[in-house]
């Protein structure tokens, strides 16, 4: 059960990290646009962009998960 949850989380983060979509921000019209609140889409876009910066750590996590699957969760 724990192994399935770890595998699900790992695959979900991998999917977010390898997306190659061009996620663009909205064009700002002037000085007053900075005061508006971020929408849910903006928050998701920022999260996916931040995942791209952690690709090396995600790769190390994948290697660790493969090791755990063989040693701990294998039968």
Swiss-Prot record:
It is found in: Membrane. Its main location: membrane. InterPro entries: SMIM7. The chain crosses the membrane at residues 54-74. Residues 1-17 form the signal peptide. It is a single-pass type I membrane protein. Keywords: Membrane, Signal, Transmembrane, Transmembrane helix. Residues 75 are cytoplasmic. One of its GO terms (cellular component) is membrane. Residues 18-53 are extracellular. Belongs to the SMIM7 family. This is Small integral membrane protein 7-B. It comes from Xenopus laevis (African clawed frog).
């Amino acid at each position: 059960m724990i192994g399935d949850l770890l595998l699900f989380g790992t695959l979900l983060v991998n999917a977010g990290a390898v997306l190659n979509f061009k996620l663009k921000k909205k064009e700002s019209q002037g000085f007053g646009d900075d005061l508006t609140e971020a929408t849910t889409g903006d928050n998701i876009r920022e999260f996916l962009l931040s995942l791209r910066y952690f690709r090396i750590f995600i790769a190390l996590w994948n290697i660790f998960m493969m090791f755990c699957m063989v040693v701990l969760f294998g039968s």
